[in-house]
Amino acid sequence: MAIPNIRIPCRQLFIDGEWREPLKKNRLPIINPANEEIIGYIPAATEEDVDMAVKAARSALRRDDWGSTTGAQRAKYLRAIAAKVLEKKPELATLETIDNGKPWFEAASDIDDVVACFEYYADLAEALDSKKQTEVKLHLDSFKTHVLREPLGVVGLITPWNYPLLMTTWKVAPALAAGCAAILKPSELASITSLELGEICREVGLPPGALSILTGLGHEAGSPLVSHPDVDKIAFTGSGPTGVKIMTAAAQLVKPVTLELGGKSPIVVFDDIHNLDTAVEWTLFGCFWTNGQICSATSRLIIQETIAPQFLARLLEWTKNIKISDPLEEDCKLGPVISRGQYEKILKFISTAKDEGATILYGGDRPEHLKKGYYIQPTIITDVDTSMEIWKEEVFGPVLCVKTFKIEEEAIELANDTKFGLGAAILSKDLERCERFTKAFQSGIVWINCSQPCFWQPPWGGKKRSGFGRELGEWSLENYLNIKQVTQYVTPDEPWAFYKSPSKL
């Protein structure tokens, strides 16, 4: 597919089905991470804009054109959005690449997943109609009970910059499928395609207020959304410290939250792997895909001593072969990280690892052939101790740290030696061993003989400090539904006979 040359659309905030200028008229620069140039501006919402969006959402839930829709009717909107996204795939992939820095072919693949995700939740929305009211059998014949599954209400969706439109879809699609009215606050570092989703919703005729999109800074737009008394739920994907702030603010209103936070996931490699090159490639993919900016990245390689020298030698050869370039170039496999702040943070992690006694086996700096942009070489760090920062903390960049083990028990201990619990991988041909590790891993996701494949049908989420709640699959739809019990006394002519009846005069 040819990569189009396009201009950056100049959008406003998307509120109540219309483009509206922020009340304070503030805008933020869009910086292309590949060349550090300002390529446009996004609107910066503040508390007043949040309040307008919440009022629009409440109004949408009261109106018949959204609040009274069936699942089948909502499914038509979701399928129309999917079709429009597919139609605009080349443009959206290009916008995402110049906004986020990921290789264009990865961005294009993400857009395919966006389409599939909207279609999947369209199917689930239709299925909701037959599940909306479910009878519950009781032990007393004088009562009957059923359960209603209703939209939770107005939901705030706060999304990250590493998969801008895809992470948006992970939240928007199930929220709309459930019949909620959603307010999206994407990361200010990569908002372009989320704003384009607003234009797509306008084009397909999504009822006003069903989805509003507010770009801007976290403390100016995100915080007021979280603490707004008329927002019924918050779903957040992002950093642990921000997740703690969101959880604390939401707790003041006893507001439910879903949190998908950071990770420091292990990939455990045994000496009985099926194929050396296949195992090496999965190890690279698990850490360096999406420029290393993946919450579930298997960035801790835990490898059996007996295969470590051979494996690391081959890993080094493969790593040196990774094409680092402008992400719009053909065959680019590693682009820039998202921002100068992230670039400096990653280099500081690498520097600290070296100061603490680790060895930089490869990388650790800017590629020599790229003078501008936030590029960092894929980096492999060995001689790592479990007390080191590089072992403990999420880097969120193309940095792999390595530690060896002798026996299974040691590998499990190392794998679980983390405050996080999002993902974990094991590479071994011994499936009984893989099953033991599946049970022993303290994580929400386990990969066997692979790393990072992600599908929209199974659940996605972690444990420990990686958050709680699940996205994707039917589990995500449940996040946006309220379960209401309805019990009827079916023998109203018969007295309940709890109190003594007054004497008749």
UniProtKB/Swiss-Prot annotation:
It catalyses: 4-aminobutanal + NAD(+) + H2O = 4-aminobutanoate + NADH + 2 H(+); 3-aminopropanal + NAD(+) + H2O = beta-alanine + NADH + 2 H(+); 4-(trimethylamino)butanal + NAD(+) + H2O = 4-(trimethylamino)butanoate + NADH + 2 H(+); 4-guanidinobutanal + NAD(+) + H2O = 4-guanidinobutanoate + NADH + 2 H(+). NAD(+) binds at residues 159-161, 185-188, 238-242, 261, 394, 460. This is Aminoaldehyde dehydrogenase 2. It comes from Solanum lycopersicum (Tomato). The keyword NAD applies. Dehydrogenase that catalyzes the oxidation of several aminoaldehydes. Metabolizes and detoxifies aldehyde products of polyamine degradation to non-toxic amino acids. Catalyzes the oxidation of 4-aminobutanal and 3-aminopropanal to 4-aminobutanoate and beta-alanine, respectively. Catalyzes the oxidation of 4-(trimethylamino)butanal and 4-guanidinobutanal to 4-trimethylammoniobutanoate and 4-guanidinobutanoate, respectively. The gene is AMADH2. GO terms for molecular function: 3-aminopropanal dehydrogenase (NAD+) activity; 4-trimethylammoniobutyraldehyde dehydrogenase activity; aminobutyraldehyde dehydrogenase (NAD+) activity; betaine-aldehyde dehydrogenase (NAD+) activity; gamma-guanidinobutyraldehyde dehydrogenase (NAD+) activity; protein homodimerization activity; sodium ion binding. Belongs to the aldehyde dehydrogenase family. Forms homodimers.
